[in-house]
Amino acid sequence: MDKLKKPILTEKSISLLEKRQYTFELDKNITKSEAKKMIETHFQVKVIHMNSYYLPINKKIRKNIGKLKRKKRMIFTLKVGDSIPFSSINMN
């Protein structure tokens, strides 16, 4: 679970929960197959689809501060009837 950093709870990600889509921030080196296996084994759910993306880096900030870490997020779509209760998500 070291590569699975935290769940993302933004307005958009909360609206995706109605479609059984959960958003997590992940380690940037994790692959889709590793992430799928990790979610399925840890939460005992079936993942049917995944989308991954990197958050954009603001060039103005990058120029002043230097190189920033890119953050990788994945959206997992679960099988009908499956859900991840937020009480079981412990990212400490």
From Swiss-Prot:
**A molecular function GO annotation:** structural constituent of ribosome
Q: In which domain of life is the source organism classified?
A: Eukaryota
Q: Where in the cell is it found?
A: Plastid, Chloroplast
Cellular component aspect of the GO annotation: chloroplast; ribonucleoprotein complex; ribosome
Q: InterPro entries recorded for this chain?
A: Nucleotide-bd_a/b_plait_sf (IPR012677), Ribosomal_uL23-like (IPR013025), Ribosomal_uL23/eL15/eS24_sf (IPR012678)
Please name one Pfam family that this protein belongs to.
Answer: Ribosomal_L23
* Gene3D superfamilies, alphabetized: 3.30.70.330
Keyword list (alphabetical) reads:
Chloroplast, Plastid, Ribonucleoprotein, Ribosomal protein, RNA-binding, rRNA-binding
Which Gene Ontology BP annotations are present?
Answer: translation
Major localization class? plastid
Subunit composition? Part of the 50S ribosomal subunit.
According to its UniProt entry, the function of this protein is described as:
Binds to 23S rRNA.
Which family is this sequence assigned to? Belongs to the universal ribosomal protein uL23 family.
This protein is called Large ribosomal subunit protein uL23c
Name the encoding gene, please: rpl23
